[in-house]
Curated annotation (Swiss-Prot):
SUPFAM superfamilies: LeuD/IlvD-like (SSF52016). It comes from Methanopyrus kandleri (strain AV19 / DSM 6324 / JCM 9639 / NBRC 100938). The keyword ATP-binding does not apply. One of its GO terms (molecular function) is 3-isopropylmalate dehydratase activity. Pathway: Amino-acid biosynthesis; L-leucine biosynthesis; L-leucine from 3-methyl-2-oxobutanoate: step 2/4. This is 3-isopropylmalate dehydratase small subunit 2. It comes from the Archaea. One of its GO terms (biological process) is L-leucine biosynthetic process. InterPro entries: Aconitase/3IPM_dehydase_swvl, AconitaseA/IPMdHydase_ssu_swvl, IPMI_Swivel, LeuD, LeuD_type2/HacB/DmdB.
Length: 168
């Protein structure tokens, strides 16, 4: 699996209220969430992001309240993948469930990648590339890879109802 796009770089402890502010949840339908993605951290993000772009972040991305809409907002904004030093577990599981690739880096990718860099996330080689710079990536669990390939856990289970991935 591989994704290439422009990097949007954020620091440590990006919480779900920065990913999709709570005030937006009462005013918009699910289909409109992408218009407000990351506006708690960067109000201009929805205008800057393009289909296939990659979010690069520090530690504890997606912390805060359990908010499935945070993942949905990123997907609807066109984000192809999120690479971070670490993820809050609830966000990470929501991302697997919804089919948004979330890949942990072995070292802080924000020390190498700059906002606007063209990056490639290569899971075959377990590396994030930004020009001549590389950041090693942790190998995601097999069930996460399967869910990402199918577009989420629900789609994976629909295609394999007699063999859910958690039984392996």
């Amino acid at each position: 699996m591989r994704w290439s796009g422009r990097a949007h770089v954020f620091g440590d402890d990006v919480d779900t209220d920065q990913i999709i502010p709570g005030r937006c949840l009462r005013r918009v339908s699910y289909d409109e969430l992408g218009r407000y993605a990351m506006t708690g951290a960067d109000p201009e993000f929805p205008e800057k992001v393009r289909e296939g772009d990659v979010i690069v972040a520090g530690k504890n991305f997606g912390c805060g309240s359990s908010r499935e809409q945070a993942v949905m907002a990123l997907q609807q904004a066109g984000v192809a993948c999120v690479v971070a030093r670490s993820f809050a577990r609830i966000f990470y599981r929501n991302a697997i469930n919804r089919g948004l690739p979330t890949v942990e880096a072995e070292e802080d990718p924000t020390e190498v990648v700059e906002d606007g860099n063209r990056v490639t996330v290569d899971l075959d080689e377990l590396v994030l590339r930004a020009g001549s710079e590389e950041v090693p990536l942790r190998e995601p669990p097999e069930f996460a890879l399967q869910a990402w390939r199918e577009g989420g856990l629900l789609e994976l289970v629909k295609k394999n109802p007699d063999k859910p991935p958690w039984r392996d």
